[in-house]
From Swiss-Prot:
Gene: pcm
Any Pfam family: PCMT
EC number, as in UniProt: 2.1.1.77
Name this protein carries in UniProt: Protein-L-isoaspartate O-methyltransferase
Alphabetical list of PROSITE patterns matching this protein: PCMT (PS01279)
Organism: Vibrio atlanticus (strain LGP32) (Vibrio splendidus (strain Mel32))
NCBIfam families: pimt, PRK00312.1
UniProt GO MF annotations: protein-L-isoaspartate (D-aspartate) O-methyltransferase activity
Reported function: Catalyzes the methyl esterification of L-isoaspartyl residues in peptides and proteins that result from spontaneous decomposition of normal L-aspartyl and L-asparaginyl residues. It plays a role in the repair and/or degradation of damaged proteins.
Coiled coil stretches, renumbered: none
Residues forming the catalytic site: 59
Amino acid sequence: MSNPQAERLVTFLIENGIQDQKVLDAIYLLPRESFLSQAMHHQAYDNNALPIGQGQTISQPYIVAKMTELLELQQDSRVLEIGTGSGYQTAVLAQLVDHVYSVERIKSLQWDAKRRLKQLDFYNISTKHGDGWQGWSSKAPFDAIIVTAAAESIPQALLQQLKDGGRLLIPVGDDEQQLLKIVRHGDEFLSSVIEMVRFVPLVPGELA
């Protein structure tokens, strides 16, 4: 069954430079309204970040697509997400790889996302309530790490949890934020600036 709103969104993403067909398909197939409150359903396929409670947001589809594309994922890529939030980005990733690990510092968001993802028949996702600054060392190393909140500086724990050749996508900064792509080469980390972005802050610690 076709979804005209999702088709319009995918057309918008293509017009704005998203080229990876697997990423476009993952976004087309995912019902974004399932990750939003009933009051937000009419905006589900707009290219906007929307509130999900606890001062957090679901990222705009463009930035989800852009960051996912930049991770250069293969089916067997080991992926860590920092900031589960609603679970939307998690679900996009889970359509592209065998397994996704995701850390969320706010317990209620983690539980809601876990329930929502199971309802949507995603069983290749492991979520954890914890401090995103620390990553998930027991599951490391990772081929790709994606951070969905802005850090004041790059968390060293995340760099150390990258495989050689692994990619880290992270927004860095306070009010003025840059989306960085960092690639590990042995003990060196090569960083490139992708574009200016606006994310909620990556706060250390965890909330019950």
